[in-house]
Amino acid sequence: MANWDHPTSKVRSTVLGLPEQVRACLFDLDGVLTDTASVHAKAWQTMFDTYLYQRAKHTGENFVPFDPTADYRQYVDGKKREDGVRSFLGSRGITLPEGSADNSGDVETIYGLGNRKDDLFRQVLKEHGIEVFDGSRRYLEAITYAGLGVAVVSSSTNTRDVLKITGLDRFVQQQVDGITLREEHIAGKPAPDSYLRGAQLLDVAPDAAAVFEDALSGVQAGLSGHFGFVVGINRTGRVDQAEELRRIGANVVVTDLAELL
């Protein structure tokens, strides 16, 4: 562990695992700072399987369940809810009306299914709480002490609540979340727009900011936004996932942010 008595650019680059020019860090939330990616995957699985099962009964088609690993990672991870619903259903050749953001969860529209998933996610959070990765908390403490800007950039509409419940809000200077994306009409990941907005709020150029992501769509956003550094987080430790994160744009891949300290 480094001596933090006099944080400098050299300390930032050598101890925080970042290039010297980086002045701000933009973090995804689920799977990067908090152990909520598995909760999201379970909520997506429950919502989609219920819908697909009922659809199969009605149409006579075979019921093929949602894969909480492969389908989650390929179609919904890191994306706005409506984009995730649209992407996965499209992979099954299913088209639904768009509906509107105020559709209740029992309405079979793109927004309705997305809201049903959000209801399930909130229920799990209420019953089981939220865990913060210890290495992520330590890394946030270190970069805060070093004077780097911190923003959370997430597609989740629950971001503010999660940050407050976990106490991570004390590290975060700015946030761009699912509510921001909807209100400001910002394109979701893999478009870089949400991360570009985060950098703008911290008043730094993209090439002076690092992006921290576990989702393929988020790493793609970091690459296409021309950010100074992209850190891929591979919680599974699987070699193929690490290689995929590198292939699509991660400069470095770690299993835990503490590896950068």
UniProtKB/Swiss-Prot annotation:
Q: Which residues carry this modification: 4-aspartylphosphate?
A: D28
Cofactor(s) needed, names only, are: Mg(2+)
Q: Which residues lie in coiled coils?
A: none
Output the Pfam families linked to this UniProt entry.
Answer: Hydrolase
Per UniProt, the cofactor note for this protein states: Binds 1 magnesium ion per subunit.
Q: Does the keyword Amino-acid biosynthesis apply?
A: no
Sorted alphabetically, the keyword list is: Carbohydrate metabolism, Isomerase, Magnesium, Metal-binding, Phosphoprotein
Q: How is it modified after translation?
A: Autophosphorylated.
Summarize where beta-D-glucose 6-phosphate binds, as residue positions.
D30, G78, R81, S156, N158
Q: Which Gene3D superfamilies match?
A: HAD superfamily/HAD-like, Putative phosphatase, domain 2
What this protein catalyses is: beta-D-glucose 1-phosphate = beta-D-glucose 6-phosphate
User: Binding of Mg(2+): at which residues?
Assistant: D28, D30, D214
Q: Which residues form the active site?
A: D28, D30
**Enzyme nomenclature, EC number:** 5.4.2.6
**GO MF terms, alphabetically ordered:** isomerase activity; metal ion binding
- Can you tell me which family this protein belongs to? Belongs to the HAD-like hydrolase superfamily. CbbY/CbbZ/Gph/YieH family.
Q: Subunit arrangement?
A: Monomer.
Q: Which purpose does this protein serve, as stated in its record?
A: Catalyzes the interconversion of D-glucose 1-phosphate (G1P) and D-glucose 6-phosphate (G6P), forming beta-D-glucose 1,6-(bis)phosphate (beta-G16P) as an intermediate.
PANTHER family xrefs: 6-PHOSPHOGLUCONATE PHOSPHATASE (PTHR46193), HEXITOL PHOSPHATASE B (PTHR46193:SF18)
NCBIfam families, alphabetized: PGMB-YQAB-SF
Protein name, please? Beta-phosphoglucomutase
